Design a protein with these regions (language model features):
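Loop-helix junctions at membrane interfaces
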Residues: 1-168
């Protein structure tokens, strides 16, 4: 492995661990056995900082491990897919829009689209588990988590850019 591949693998591993920890540190139970957390900011960061494959893996693995370690094993497979898709959306949204409207607006827009996918993804997943009518109660909580993820992720990416850490 060359230095560049090693660096990418180390960055991805660190971000996956950070995603897991950020998801587990502050857990606010939601009405239907899930929980609110701060992991979405790392999910978005992984999409904005890494390649699509690494971003998907970081977001999916880090978030799913947090579910497993926290006793939400039933959620882990859905979390892997939903959070991985969020990172892909953040990546491609940023890449497509970045040159057209600038970095900050493209990150905000890609973050909003990614978080909408998260809210809808968990609504559908919980709809199959608990019924679609009861699953509606988690939509506002997931939306709040999404807004927090966008705000914190946008702040952190600016810090990373200024310090030149974790940039490919």
């Amino acid at each position: 492995m060359n230095n560049s591949k090693t660096k990418k693998l180390v960055m991805a591993s660190l971000l996956a661990a950070l995603c897991c920890v950020a998801t587990m540190i502050i857990k606010i139970p939601s009405p239907l056995k899930g929980y609110l957390n701060l992991g979405d900011c790392v999910v978005l960061l992984s999409g904005w900082l890494l390649s699509p494959a690494y971003g998907f893996a970081v977001a999916g693995v880090g978030s799913a491990l947090a579910d497993i370690f926290s006793g939400y094993v039933t959620y882990a497979p859905a979390t892997f897919v939903i959070k991985g898709l969020m990172a892909l959306i953040a990546y491609y949204g940023f890449k497509i829009l970045g040159n057209k409207i600038g970095n900050l607006p493209s990150r905000i827009i890609s973050g909003i689209v990614a978080e909408i996918v998260m809210v809808l993804g968990y609504f559908v997943f919980e709809g199959f588990l608990y019924g679609f009518i009861p699953s509606i109660v988690n939509i506002p909580a997931n939306a709040v988590q999404g807004v927090a993820g966008i705000i914190i992720g946008t702040i952190l990416i600016k810090v990373f850019e200024k310090s030149k850490i974790m940039m490919e």
